[in-house]
Amino acid sequence: METVISFTAIAVAIMIGLAALGTGIGFAILGGKFLEASARQPELAPALQTKMFIVAGLLDAISMIAVGVALFFVFANPFLGQLAG
């Protein structure tokens, strides 16, 4: 049982870490491309900014889903029920 708990803790750490890494890389690429596009065509900056914030919200949602799944595994681990039963 301790093995399942330790592997779950490692999996949760990997999930949260990769979600944070992916979100950080995504925001960096998104911000860089937004600044590049705004520098090329400044008149499109307001429209691009709206689209950038929508995509930023989707990027942030992906990491929040990963945190939710990780918290599910921490507090309501479904694998422990299979060991007990």
From Swiss-Prot:
Which GO cellular component terms are attached?
Answer: plasma membrane; proton-transporting ATP synthase complex; proton-transporting two-sector ATPase complex, proton-transporting domain
Mind listing the UniProt keywords for this protein, alphabetically?
ATP synthesis, Cell inner membrane, Cell membrane, CF(0), Hydrogen ion transport, Ion transport, Lipid-binding, Membrane, Transmembrane, Transmembrane helix, Transport
Q: Which residues cross the membrane?
A: 10-30, 53-73
Pfam families attached here? ATP-synt_C (PF00137)
Q: In which compartments does the protein localize?
A: Cell inner membrane
Which residue positions does UniProt flag as site: Reversibly protonated during proton transport?
60
According to Swiss-Prot or TrEMBL, what is its membrane topology?
A: Multi-pass membrane protein
Signal peptide interval: none
Q: Which PROSITE patterns match?
A: ATPASE_C
Report the domain of life of the source organism: Bacteria
Tell me which stretches of the chain form a coiled coil.
none
Plastid keyword on record: no
Does Membrane appear among the keywords?
Answer: yes
Gene Ontology molecular function = lipid binding; proton-transporting ATP synthase activity, rotational mechanism
Function of the molecule: F(1)F(0) ATP synthase produces ATP from ADP in the presence of a proton or sodium gradient. F-type ATPases consist of two structural domains, F(1) containing the extramembraneous catalytic core and F(0) containing the membrane proton channel, linked together by a central stalk and a peripheral stalk. During catalysis, ATP synthesis in the catalytic domain of F(1) is coupled via a rotary mechanism of the central stalk subunits to proton translocation. Key component of the F(0) channel; it plays a direct role in translocation across the membrane. A homomeric c-ring of between 10-14 subunits forms the central stalk rotor element with the F(1) delta and epsilon subunits.
The UniProt subunit note reads as follows: F-type ATPases have 2 components, F(1) - the catalytic core - and F(0) - the membrane proton channel. F(1) has five subunits: alpha(3), beta(3), gamma(1), delta(1), epsilon(1). F(0) has three main subunits: a(1), b(2) and c(10-14). The alpha and beta chains form an alternating ring which encloses part of the gamma chain. F(1) is attached to F(0) by a central stalk formed by the gamma and epsilon chains, while a peripheral stalk is formed by the delta and b chains.
Question: Family, per the entry?
Answer: Belongs to the ATPase C chain family.
Task: Tell me the protein's name.
Answer: ATP synthase subunit c
Naturally occurring in which organism (per UniProt): Shewanella pealeana (strain ATCC 700345 / ANG-SQ1)
Traced from the root, the source organism's taxonomic lineage reads: Bacteria, Pseudomonadati, Pseudomonadota, Gammaproteobacteria, Alteromonadales
Q: Which gene encodes it?
A: atpE
